A protein has these predicted regions:
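Serine-esterase "nucleophile elbow" of acetyl-processing enzymes
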Residues: 29-90, 109-110
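Oxyanion-hole/transition-state-stabilizing segment in secreted/luminal serine hydrolases
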Residues: 98-139, 163-164
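N-terminal secretory signal peptides and thylakoid transit peptides that target proteins
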Residues: 1-17
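Short amphipathic alpha-helices and their capping/turn segments at secondary-structure boundaries
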Residues: 29-39, 101-113, 143-152
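Substrate-gating cap/lid alpha-helix
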Residues: 166-204
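Structural recognition of the beta-strand scaffold that forms the well-ordered cores
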Residues: 40-42, 88-92, 115-119, 157-160, ...
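A structural motif corresponding to the C-terminal end of an alpha-helix
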Residues: 78-86, 146-156, 188-203
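Histidine-centered active-site loop/cap adjacent to the catalytic His
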Residues: 185-189, 198-201, 216-239
């Protein structure tokens, strides 16, 4: 069957927009430079959820994804956004212990590549592990193992628990002998190190913060604005 010239022109007009229109995927690839977006997840305690402890409301996850160039010009162009498309899913909660981690993954949906940051153990020490003689530490290890095994994100970057006394026993603020506290802090960090070898990498906040000063902290134990940036400094090269 032969088509009239007029009908052929009409069909060509209909087809032209379809040919010219890029696919949704093509448009997304163009917007991201061809790189698929990935997600930075944060889990754990106030080391990662410290926005309420500074006037700017910033926490390490935010600074990692998008630096505040006015506050921290040193990190201009060094944030994760500079490497490509990335989003933050912030789930860490101030005050969390290892038993609270399960609630932080409730409703979690993962798609595409991702990296998880985890800081945990400091509140567990404050709530009893600092004076523990063994049983509590085993429960901590078991609970952390359960959480990490179920977490559908790899790698996991585990941050060690820092020491706000800078290793100075005269700054001890607990009613437990400093030697006992330090031994249990070391045990918690050893547990974190073991899981970091298995599931990702270790962010040694403890070692880094020993080289800091009191301006890195507020309210004795919480990261200050500077402290939030220093937490970011430790995690950044591991991502």
């Amino acid at each position: 069957m032969r088509l009239s010239i007029a009908r052929r022109r009409w069909l060509a007009m209909l087809a032209a927009p379809l040919i010219a229109m890029p696919s949704t995927r093509s448009r997304a690839d163009a917007a991201t430079g061809g790189n698929p977006p990935w997600t930075l997840f944060t889990f754990g305690d106030s080391i990662l959820d410290c926005g309420r402890y500074n006037a700017h409301g910033v926490h390490p996850g935010q600074l990692l994804v998008r630096n505040d160039d006015a506050l921290f010009p040193e990190f201009k162009g060094r944030d994760l956004q500079a490497r490509g498309p990335v989003r933050l899913e912030h789930r860490a909660v101030d005050g969390a212990t290892v038993d609270d981690l399960a609630a932080q993954v409730r409703g979690l949906r993962t798609s595409g590549p991702g990296v998880a940051l985890l800081t945990i153990g400091g509140n567990d020490l404050l709530r009893g592990l600092a004076r523990d003689s063994g049983a509590g530490m085993r429960r901590f290890e078991t609970a952390l193992d359960r959480f990490l095994t179920a977490l559908p994100i790899r790698p996991v970057l585990l941050g060690t628990v820092y020491d706000p006394t800078f290793g100075d026993d005269t700054r001890n603020f607990l009613d437990v002998a400093p030697a006992i506290v330090r031994a249990n802090l070391r045990r918690v960090n050893d547990i974190l190190g073991t899981f970091a070898q298995r599931d990702g990498r270790l962010a040694d906040l403890h070692a880094h913060f020993l080289r800091g000063d009191p301006s890195w902290f507020t309210r004795t134990i919480e990261p200050s604005l500077i402290g939030a940036s220093e937490v970011r400094r430790v995690f950044l090269p591991l991502i």
